[in-house]
Amino acid sequence: MWLQPIVVLAAIIIGARLGGIGLGVMGGLGLALLCFVFGLQPTAPPIDVMLMIVAVISAASCMQAAGGLDYMVKLAERMLRKHPSRVTLLSPLVTYLFTFVAGTGHIAYSVLPVIAEVARETKIRPERPLGIAVIASQQAITASPISAATVALLGMLAGFDISLFDILKISVPATLIGVLVGAFCSMKVGKELEDDPEYQRRLKEGVIENRLVETASSFDVRKARISVGIFLLATFLIVLFGSVDALRPVFQSDGKNVPLDMPSIIEIVMLSTSALILLVCRIDGIKAVQGSIFSA
């Protein structure tokens, strides 16, 4: 029935416009219409996917509270300012790496103002690096070993003797090549700023100001490095568990040896990562939930 996809699309669009928890609650309203009005039977809620997202976001939020995200942004800023003429090529690689490591695209938001500033300083149209940088951060979700998308695919292919490493050796090169091709194409988007009359007019009238974007510098470098190190170690362990089945704990179920599933491993490892960051770096847990990653 053609009304059903309209209900789904309307719930997504309205939820996205509401922002915050709007997408989630509008999804519930859309489900209510499909269930009670159209008589469709709802499936089981994706509990594992939701728990994985919560676990990964919790770990990333704790890393941000420890200054790890600011430390990563500082490193990215240093690299971009060292090679400003290559910002269109380097910025998507930076956001790709951020998302690949964290498993969520929200972590890449912090570096976008730096990318825009470096582009303006170099007289490069900001939409060139910014556009492909945002795309790259989303492409990395399908290649990240700890993203819900990758683990969901791993679960679907569980009966075909396909490991996490088998997925990554296809998804990582494919997405990286696509991002690089897109970056090269983005280098020719629009006129050069010095040849753009509208940009020159706005610059002359003071509508556009080349203000300096200051990244956070008040964080404890030692704690920041430790938090990033713990997070990277957790990501490595997840790849290891997903690639080598023999490393997973095995339990008896109906007389058969059943290894611990990857969603549970990701949830356990990432929640443990959150705890370790809080304990080792001595971070206030309330500070973690007040950060931009958790609220996003």
Regions from the language model: what does each represent?
Residues 39-45, 155-165, 244-258:
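Membrane-interface helix termini and inter-helical loops of multi-pass transporters
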Residues 1-5, 29-38, 111-127, 169-175, ...:
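Hydrophobic alpha-helical transmembrane segments
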Residues 14-16, 26-32, 40-124, 128-129, ...:
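Membrane-embedded alpha-helical segments and adjacent helix-loop junctions characteristic
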Residues 2-14, 18-37, 47-58, 224-236, ...:
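Hydrophobic mid-bilayer segments of alpha-helices in multi-pass membrane transport proteins
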Residues 7, 22-25, 83, 167-179:
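C-terminal transmembrane helix pair
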Residues 57, 98-112, 126-166, 170, ...:
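Alpha-helical transmembrane segments and, especially, the helix-loop junctions at the ends
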Residues 169-292:
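Long, contiguous bundles of hydrophobic transmembrane helices that form the permeation core
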Residues 14, 23, 87-98, 126, ...:
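Transmembrane helical cores of multi-pass ion-transport proteins
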